[in-house]
Amino acid sequence: MGVKTFTHSSSSHSQEMLGKLNMLRNDGHFCDITIRVQDKIFRAHKVVLAACSDFFRTKLVGQAEDENKNVLDLHHVTVTGFIPLLEYAYTATLSINTENIIDVLAAASYMQMFSVASTCSEFMKSSILWNTPNSQPEKGLDAGQENNSNCNFTSRDGSISPVSSECSVVERTIPVCRESRRKRKSYIVMSPESPVKCGTQTSSPQVLNSSASYSENRNQPVDSSLAFPWTFPFGIDRRIQPEKVKQAENTRTLELPGPSETGRRMADYVTCESTKTTLPLGTEEDVRVKVERLSDEEVHEEVSQPVSASQSSLSDQQTVPGSEQVQEDLLISPQSSSIGSVDEGVSEGLPTLQSTSSTNAPPDDDDRLENVQYPYQLYIAPSTSSTERPSPNGPDRPFQCPTCGVRFTRIQNLKQHMLIHSGIKPFQCDRCGKKFTRAYSLKMHRLKHEGKRCFRCQICSATFTSFGEYKHHMRVSRHIIRKPRIYECKTCGAMFTNSGNLIVHLRSLNHEASELANYFQSSDFLVPDYLNQEQEETLVQYDLGEHGFESNSSVQMPVISQYHSKGKEP
């Protein structure tokens, strides 16, 4: 008689093991490592940390067993970012909200927990909407629904909503009016890779029946006030801008996936808009932020708007020819241009100077940034107001980026800069697929596909699609008087016109950063006699031809208004 074998596989064993390990950690039993984060002590087990994080495995595997150094300091991690990751290692449950998402993402990247970092990135990029059903859900669930492998989104108020393992769309029962923002922001994500069954949490009396609510709420519009305040694209609420309120528009509804589609991901971004109405500006609590996605029609509408010169103005006004002039002087006039077909496209895309200066013009990017809510409020704590300029006695650039350390004079510039570190580029070109962080960058990019050239050099009639290309043309062409090469490399004797080129040259010679700092603190890199009388006379005698230039300084740039006032066409 043959030997009979029996194999038993327990699906709850891994869950029980994690629960018991977490109990041992809370009681302080068998903890063999101490982690210090910002002077706060955490006790844990080496085997659990090494199994969850490649960073800890590299740190702990190489240690000798008889070594008494069991304290590990994490200098680049905050307490608010480390606690959710430690709980995730022992419970397979990640609890994040809009207040600690940046800290958790930075800590997960530093600790090489890439799956958690990917989840945080998806949470930042996606739009999480909550649907409010009219009828109360059933309290009891079938046995098949209790064993459902779909993960749950659990809010801080205790409601649990079923959702697919890829976290596509969610529901919850929640009061709409005057609810705490902190409760609306917070949620708990069950890891799809963990063996923890989500059916263990179905004992709550507020569990939603996904199959029942699907047929009831299929055609119900979703209340956009329940969206997170900084969801895609970071909570831009157009309802508080009366000038940009559109006319009657069809109400869009959110179609929830059926029971057979629970394993599929929803669309990349879910757009939900109720009927657009103008709301009066009240308190901050009354203004409800909705989730918007820039559709192809809206992108086309944004691109077709007039490109005013004020929107294309740059902060570097010292290198702009005739910085006292308005950039409308650079716009192509259909009557004065001789390009032909290009002017027809420009005449359609660009208004006259009177229309660009009208009072009903839409606000620029800086004004729109005032109404944007960002998840970086913890890092932005300036001494001055967001709408005020720095005081004369204070620092020139009080707003500093916590990631790279770049400082800015305005809070709007810092907010726009933080989008670069987030990696979110919500504006995508529908022709070539290139993505941009700002809507204005997409607008200028679309002009290249349409063949519209909005800026023209009034000296050589060259046309450009952006003001940056025009500035580059003025630098590399012979339209401006060449600057003298006043920066000299003491190593090889090379001369340069600006310090930036000298820095690039010194880096090519493998100069360290400290050496560069000491090098530029002294004035030895400047030629001693670069501003003598002979060089000034040489620059004044520069052949300007028929173009009128001012000669009140050694380095001049053409003043376009003078050339235009003579009535000479290029």
From Swiss-Prot:
A zinc finger (C2H2-type) spans 399-421, 427-449, 455-479, 487-511. It is found in: Nucleus. Keywords: DNA-binding, Isopeptide bond, Metal-binding, Nucleus, Phosphoprotein, Repeat, Transcription, Transcription regulation, Ubl conjugation, Zinc, Zinc-finger. Residues 304-318 have a biased composition (Low complexity). This is Zinc finger and BTB domain-containing protein 44. The modification Phosphothreonine is found at residue 200. GO terms for molecular function: DNA binding; zinc ion binding. Residues 31-98 form the BTB domain. Residues 194-220, 243-267, 295-369 are annotated as: Disordered.
